[in-house]
Design a protein with these regions (language model features):
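Compositionally biased, intrinsically disordered low-complexity segments
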Residues: 31, 172, 223-225
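Phosphate-binding loop of NTP-binding sites
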Residues: 13-14, 27-29, 38-200
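Beta-strand->loop->alpha-helix junctions that form or flank phosphate-binding loops
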Residues: 2-4, 20-23, 58-65, 102-106, ...
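Short polybasic amphipathic segments
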Residues: 232-234
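N-terminal beta-loop-helix "entrance" segment that forms/cooperates
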Residues: 3-20, 109-113
């Protein structure tokens, strides 16, 4: 259910999913697992009814983790750019002959949706740091676009914000790989930390734009990068 009509609700209806506008305890089936986002408060009548009945209630990140269980899970995180990066990666994998499952926080034009159930064993998802819920994931690969201080109303300081990304790196499955942008100081520091922990780490940057915190050149150097606001090439 949602508070008001939207194109997303129309898309769900077209997919055969029953949706409700407005929140009401009567909307909750007695045998349902209830999935909530961080924005849903305990006072929400549907959540309150599920709690009263003793039904299973899980966060949407936990539901996503269950959906990705047993798959090669690629989680894309960062204060900025994670939606674009996860969408671009998803389309690149499709063009390469993979058929990944996808969960992105915006509509991908080629799909007409931000979600897609593929036939392959790769799952690409945008990982949200704003509420710390990305700590519910156990990715095979983590991509961090940047760790620029954000959501300080929750975290309180740059140090605390960077620490949650350190914790995120700790969620990597054994033998997993961390990919970090070497141009951003926060992600560069994260890469250096990960290497001290013996984690397979790959950094990338445009030629000559590496952060001093990287301590050297990036592993992958991007040359002749161009963008027109709609497409990019290098």
């Amino acid at each position: 259910s949602d508070q008001k009509e939207s194109p997303i609700l129309d898309h769900l209806r077209d997919a055969g999913i029953e949706v409700f506008v407005g929140h009401d305890a009567a909307h909750v089936p007695a045998d349902a697992v209830v999935v909530v986002s961080t924005a849903v408060r305990e006072s929400n009548p549907e959540l309150a009814e599920a709690r009263r009945r003793g039904q299973s209630v899980i966060h949407r990140s936990q539901a996503l983790a269950l959906a990705a269980s047993g798959m090669r899970f690629v989680a894309v995180a960062g204060a900025h750019g994670k939606t674009t990066t996860s969408a671009m990666l998803s389309m690149a994998l499709r063009d390469a002959g993979e058929d990944p499952s996808i969960a992105v926080g915006a509509v991908i034009p080629q799909l007409g949706s931000g979600a897609y159930l593929g036939s392959g064993d790769v799952f690409v998802a945008e990982a949200d740091e704003s509420d710390g819920s990305f700590l519910n994931y156990t990715p095979w690969i983590e991509i961090v676009t940047n760790v620029e201080p954000d959501h300080l109303d929750r975290y309180g300081s740059r140090e605390a914000f960077e620490q949650v990304f350190v914790d995120f790196v700790g969620c990597l499955r054994q033998g997993g790989t961390l990919v970090c942008c070497g141009e951003d100081g926060g992600s560069a520091r994260l890469a250096r930390y990960a290497r001290t922990q013996g984690i397979d780490t790959v950094t990338y940057a445009r030629a000559g734009h590496e952060s001093a915190d990287l301590g050297g050149s990036a592993d992958v150097i991007i040359e002749e990068a161009h963008t027109d606001g709609h497409t990019a090439s290098a």
